[in-house]
Amino acid sequence: MQSNIMKIIIIVSLLIVVGTLYVLLSLSTPKKPLAGQVNIYKDNIKIGEAFELIDQNGEIFNSNKLRGHLSLIYFGFTSCPDICPTFLNKMTNIVEILHQNQIDIIPIFITIDPKRDTPEVLKEYIKNFHPKFICLTGNEHQIKDVTDKFKILYARVNGYDDDQNYMIDHSSFTYLIDKNGKYIKHFYLDISAKEIMEFLRNE
């Protein structure tokens, strides 16, 4: 009887020790940052430069066309089930509120999935959001170039065998760009029209 009790005490003690070590190791191990955060939060890093892509009408779109306008830029893909449409809905609401406050701003959606997101697909998809949206795509090289300029990280998720049915993991930031095409600030899902207006007033 006493032998069984001692065995139980030893096992429980070992479990406590192992559990404690696991917690201590977890706390001491640096957490892996979210995609895109490694670069974007560094000081003095250059974000956003000139780019040229194809819009939802199949026309060449040069970023110089945004000169003279504030713009909000978001990177995503039309097959995204949740985060992308959430951001685009938020951007739609923000553009409406800013317009009501006499602040003109252009919403931009740049795909990270040019293989599936053709101009035709983008044109149909964006009907669900603000009519001022400009949707942009391009070839793989062009998309890689613009995502590098905005420090966006993205990668196809493993486990999808179908070449037309897959998911993409990616950074989720919305960029505020000034009238000269320069990066001002980036936001995450908590982006709001109020925050943008307050920020612009203090600029």
UniProtKB/Swiss-Prot annotation:
Coiled coil: none
Signal peptide range: none
Pfam families the record matches: SCO1-SenC (PF02630)
Residues reported to bind Cu cation: C80, C84, H170
Gene Ontology MF terms in the entry: metal ion binding
Metal-binding as UniProt keyword: yes
Classification via PROSITE patterns: THIOREDOXIN_2
Transmembrane segments: none
This protein's UniProt keywords: Copper, Metal-binding
Thioredoxin domain segment(s): 42-203
Family under the similarity heading: Belongs to the SCO1/2 family.
Name of the protein described by the UniProt record: SCO2-like protein RT0576
Species assigned in the record: Rickettsia typhi (strain ATCC VR-144 / Wilmington)
